[in-house]
Curated annotation (Swiss-Prot):
Species name: Mus musculus (Mouse)
Main location: cytoplasm
Gene field: Sike1
Matching InterPro entries: SIKE
Coiled coil: 70-102, 164-192
Keyword entries, A-Z: Coiled coil, Cytoplasm
GO molecular function: protein kinase binding; protein-macromolecule adaptor activity; small GTPase binding
Protein's name in the database: Suppressor of IKBKE 1
């Protein structure tokens, strides 16, 4: 019976070590999520600068067209989508860690229940104290993981809302860019017609 108790204590320590590893992995996921949030925020700030460029003089529009802003906007849109997908994958991974922790805790409780059934033949007080200590720490770690999961869920929801706003802004900027290009084209055509009109009378005068 003492071997069974020692085995349960050993299993409990092993489960606790696995729990700590899962906790470290969860913290790493949270750090990665925070880094993604910073990258998305930086891209949104970069996108906010674009409207100022569209408000410059018409003479600058021609120079801006060399950089193909609609392509840049499309690239930023794709990058934001990738960041959103990566963030969701991190959140799913965190939930998988949480499920694993709950499974570990369930197995641990089952082992302790088996011990309690057989405790009549042995003084199980030392084991019960060890169980209480390990159980409290495991419950604390699970609570932390649950809190991390809740934070990441809220972050994903906020990112979804911000992403919709960014998409709307990008569509607006693309429309403005199209209109500016049309104005530039009309202006260029008018200038060309004016030059041709001035050249024609001059040619007739020379004759």
């Amino acid at each position: 019976m003492s071997c069974t108790i020692e085995k349960i204590l050993t299993d409990a320590k092993t489960l606790l070590e696995r729990l700590r590893e899962h906790d470290a992995a969860a913290e790493s996921l949270v750090d990665q999520s925070a880094a993604l949030h910073r990258r998305v925020a930086a891209m949104r700030e970069a996108g906010a600068v674009l409207p100022e460029q569209y408000q410059e003089d018409a003479s600058d529009v021609k120079d801006m067209s060399k950089y193909k802003p609609h392509i840049l906007l499309s690239q930023e849109n794709t990058q934001i989508r990738d960041l959103q997908q990566e963030n969701r994958e991190l959140w799913v991974s965190l939930e998988e860690h949480q499920d694993a922790l709950e499974l570990i805790m369930s197995k641990y409780r089952k082992q302790m229940l088996q011990l309690m059934v057989a405790k009549k033949a042995v003084d199980a007080e030392p084991v019960l104290k060890a169980h209480q200590s390990h159980s409290a720490e495991i419950e604390s770690q699970i609570d932390r993981i649950c809190e991390m999961g809740a934070v990441m869920r809220r972050a994903v929801q906020v990112d979804d809302n911000q992403f919709c706003k960014v998409q709307e802004r990008l569509a607006q900027l693309e429309l403005e860019n199209k209109e500016l290009r049309e104005l530039l084209s009309i202006s260029s055509e008018s200038l060309q017609v004016g030059k041709e009109s001035s050249v024609a009378p001059a040619s007739q005068t020379i004759k």
